[in-house]
Every structure is written in structure tokens, then in C-alpha cells.
Amino acid sequence: MKEEKEYTLVEENNHIEQRASIIYNPPQEKEPILPQIISFVLNPVFMVIYSVAIIFLSTDFTFLFANQFIRFMTPVIFFSCIIPVSGIYFLRLTHVIKDYHLDNRSEWILPLSVFFLSYALLFYYFFSAKLYIWFLAVILTPLILLVIYAIISRFWKISAYMMAIGGMIGCILSVCYNIKGLNLPVLFMILFILAGCLGVSRLMLNRSTPAQVYVGFLVGSVVSYLWVYIGTYWSLILFLRNL
């Protein structure tokens, strides 16, 4: 309940009469905690970190870069998470954006530019290290999805969360099946369960509609799978040329 007081002048008595009016504001429903936790843990800014970490631990990278996991992951964490988060925080601090949800599309240009620049620097770092082309395709996937997200969002809202987790799953599936010939059913089952939990969480928080959730996951997974798949055959072509 909120009380507002207003004052009016009564001419015949030449005094101020105070009138009080009561305005009822219904209490706002609190958002459920568990969906908020899931949305935070599976935030798009963490997906590149999860993707690279899973690929590192599930492939021969563990042997090729033995005892270098922290060193390998440090630039990934720095460029894909710390720089974008710091940039968004600075934009919020300077009131360039009103909130972190970025509901206003007119505020998207600078935040998306921050993410694009960060992912581009990450790609350049590993490109300079001359790693496998298929791995560079994995690193380049967030840039591709970011461009697709920006284009689609001009006409229709799509779930960035589901695009991100779909991109992670697509990359890991493509690496395991097309490059390393690995069959990891337990890992894949866990990833799809997490994607389902994230989709339900976004619906419970009223952040997305079912169509936005489904399309976001489909676009992210298909594009990332095919992109890494193309990177695999491109690396094979380059290898054959050098024979």
C-alpha cells in the first residue's frame, strides 16, 4: 500500500486543507531462484569457456598440451568472459545502457561490438599460435553466431541463451564425431539435459517464448556443427595440398 498526500486551497476558509489518497500497488511476484541460478551458470558468456574446456579434456589435447590446462584456458577466460563482462559493466556504469538485460534494442550496438571485438581477439590469439584449423573453427563459432543473432534480432527476438548453449553442443558433437571419432553418450546426455533445463528456466522467467527457445537452440546447434564440420574438411584440403 502506498499513501500519497495532496494539498488543495479552499477559498472560503483561506486555509490549506490536506487530503490523503490511497493508491494500491499490487506486490510484484518474485522470480523463482532455481531458474535464475541455472540462467547464471549457463550464461552465454561462459559457453566458450565450457566448450574449450570440454574439448580439451575429451580429446588428445590433454596429451598434446600436458600440464598446460590453466595456461591454455587463461586467454579463453580473459577474452571471452572478463573483457566482455567488464565492457558491459562499464557501459552500465556510464548509463550507456539502462540494464544488463538489454531489453531496449537501440542499446545493442555497443554491447554487441564489445563481444564481437573480444571474440575476434580470442580468434587472433589462437590463429597466431597456429593451432588446428578445426579448433580455430570452434573459436570462430561465437563470432558467426553473434552476427546471425544480430541479423535475426532486427526482425524477431531469438533466445541468445539457447543459441549459445546450442552452439556449444554443436561444436562438441562435431569435434567428437567428425574429427576425433569419439562416442561420449554420457557427456552428450548431460549436455542435452542442461540445455533442456536452461530452456525451461528461460520460459519460467518469462524471458523467452517457446518458439524463441526452440529456434535459438536449433540455429545455434546446426550452425556450429556445420561450421566446425567445414573447418575439418578445409584443414584436410590444406593438408593434402602440402603433400
Set out the residue ranges of the language-model regions:
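Short, Lys/Arg-rich, polar N-terminal cytosolic tail immediately upstream
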Residues: 1-35
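Juxtamembrane helix-capping/reentrant segments at transmembrane boundaries
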Residues: 32, 98-114
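The first (N-terminal) embedded transmembrane alpha-helix
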Residues: 38-59
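Membrane-interface helix termini and inter-helical loops of multi-pass transporters
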Residues: 59-68, 96-100, 128-130, 232-243
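Loop-to-helix transition at the N-terminal end of transmembrane alpha-helices
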Residues: 65-81, 102-106
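Transmembrane alpha-helix boundary signature
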Residues: 88-96, 122-135
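Core segments of transmembrane alpha-helices
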Residues: 113-123, 164-169
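Membrane-embedded catalytic cores of phosphoryl/pyrophosphoryl-handling enzymes
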Residues: 129-243
